[in-house]
């Protein structure tokens, strides 16, 4: 059986809540933040707010780092708090206007991260330089994806932007392949 640790940091206080009914973690390949949903039992110690940090680890491996975006009480059990946390790609739903020239898609993503104070991990150099581009009142997802789409058309290389446990990461999809075969024998 796997050892699952869920931690909420509220200010300088580290909380280990009692989780009810399991945890749901989901990711999409593009255009959506990672999402962690869970329910916790409210006790005399548990006190946290929207914006507090959440970390999920399984068997000692960090799987998710994000922030509480919604919390609500269930009508069926008033002492249970239903929580949805999202990784920092949630901020890529913000809209902004960017005018840039002579930048690679990796540079555009780094520029957005710096402007919005987001943590950056490994951003693979996308190589292709975009001559100029204007993005008017577009989501940060669209701005980043448009730069990645131009790179795909020019270099035929597909890059994936994701949040790797609290760090924006950009990686060539070819380097993400696993030596894994799923067939009738492996799934049971």
Language model: regions and residue ranges:
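Short acidic/His/Gly/Ser-rich catalytic and metal-binding motifs that mark active-site loops
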Residues: 91-94, 121-123
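Second-shell loop/turn segments in exported
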Residues: 94-102, 131-134
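Glycine-rich, acidic and aromatic/proline-enriched surface loops and short helix-turn segments
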Residues: 104-121
């Amino acid at each position: 059986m796997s050892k699952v640790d869920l931690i909420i940091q509220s200010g300088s206080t580290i909380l280990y809540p009692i989780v009810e009914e399991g945890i749901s973690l989901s990711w999409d390949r593009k255009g959506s933040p990672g999402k962690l949903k869970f329910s916790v039992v409210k006790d005399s110690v548990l006190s946290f707010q929207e914006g507090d940090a959440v970390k999920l680890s399984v068997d000692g491996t960090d799987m998710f780092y994000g922030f509480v975006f919604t919390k609500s009480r269930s009508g069926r059990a008033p002492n249970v708090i239903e929580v949805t946390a999202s990784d920092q790609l949630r901020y890529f739903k913000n809209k902004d206007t960017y005018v840039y020239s002579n930048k690679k898609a990796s540079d555009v993503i780094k520029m957005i991260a710096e402007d919005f104070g987001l943590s950056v991990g490994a951003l693979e150099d996308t190589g292709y330089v975009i001559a100029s581009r204007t993005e008017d009142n577009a989501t940060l997802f669209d701005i980043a994806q448009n730069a990645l789409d131009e790179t795909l058309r020019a270099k035929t290389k597909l890059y994936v932007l994701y949040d790797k446990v609290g760090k924006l990461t950009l990686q060539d999809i070819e380097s993400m392949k696993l030596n894994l075969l799923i067939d009738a024998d492996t799934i049971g």
